[in-house]
From Swiss-Prot:
<keyword id="KW-0732">Signal</keyword>
<dbReference type="GO" id="GO:0005615">
    <property type="term" value="C:extracellular space"/>
</dbReference>
<dbReference type="InterPro" id="IPR029034">
    <property type="entry name" value="Cystine-knot_cytokine"/>
</dbReference>
<feature type="glycosylation site" description="N-linked (GlcNAc...) asparagine">
    <location>
        <position position="69"/>
    </location>
</feature>
<feature type="disulfide bond">
    <location>
        <begin position="45"/>
        <end position="98"/>
    </location>
</feature>
<comment type="subunit">
    <text>Heterodimer of an alpha and a beta chain.</text>
</comment>
<keyword id="KW-1015">Disulfide bond</keyword>
<keyword id="KW-0372">Hormone</keyword>
<feature type="glycosylation site" description="N-linked (GlcNAc...) asparagine">
    <location>
        <position position="94"/>
    </location>
</feature>
<feature type="disulfide bond">
    <location>
        <begin position="49"/>
        <end position="100"/>
    </location>
</feature>
<dbReference type="GO" id="GO:0010893">
    <property type="term" value="P:positive regulation of steroid biosynthetic process"/>
</dbReference>
<keyword id="KW-0964">Secreted</keyword>
<protein>
    <recommendedName>
        <fullName>Glycoprotein hormones alpha chain 1</fullName>
    </recommendedName>
</protein>
<dbReference type="GO" id="GO:0016914">
    <property type="term" value="C:follicle-stimulating hormone complex"/>
</dbReference>
<comment type="function">
    <text>Involved in gametogenesis and steroidogenesis.</text>
</comment>
<feature type="signal peptide">
    <location>
        <begin position="1"/>
        <end position="13"/>
    </location>
</feature>
<feature type="disulfide bond">
    <location>
        <begin position="27"/>
        <end position="77"/>
    </location>
</feature>
């Protein structure tokens, strides 16, 4: 009876916990140790944002060369603001603010 109670409690706790971002931190600034120098830190945006999938609207589906039933949409952790800096003769963008927005590497 005690073991059953413990198992039920664990199952209930697991069900109510937010498992959407396990293993991935929120989108935020993090110091880049490779390019940072003492007194001159360089930051970059890292972390996770949402993605979702939904049924493709009929109007959109008709316009597709290869119709797909499911459409997915994702956002990535990208720099909202940044300033150009030079570190060891390498031009970099030091991120100053992050947000979840269009994934640039998905654009063609």
């Amino acid at each position: 009876s005690l073991i059953l109670s413990i198992l039920l409690y664990m199952a209930d706790s697991y069900q109510n916990s937010d498992m959407t971002n396990v293993g991935c931190e929120e989108c935020k600034l993090k110091e880049n140790k490779v390019f940072s120098n003492p007194g001159a830190p360089v930051y970059q945006c890292t972390g996770c944002c949402f993605s979702r999938a939904y049924p493709t609207p009929l109007q959109s589906k008709k316009a597709m060369l290869v119709p797909k039933n499911i459409t997915s949409e994702a956002t990535c952790c990208v720099a909202k603001e940044g300033e150009r800096v030079v570190v060891d003769n390498i031009k970099l963008t030091n991120h100053t603010e992050c947000w979840c927005n269009t994934c640039y590497h998905h654009k063609s």
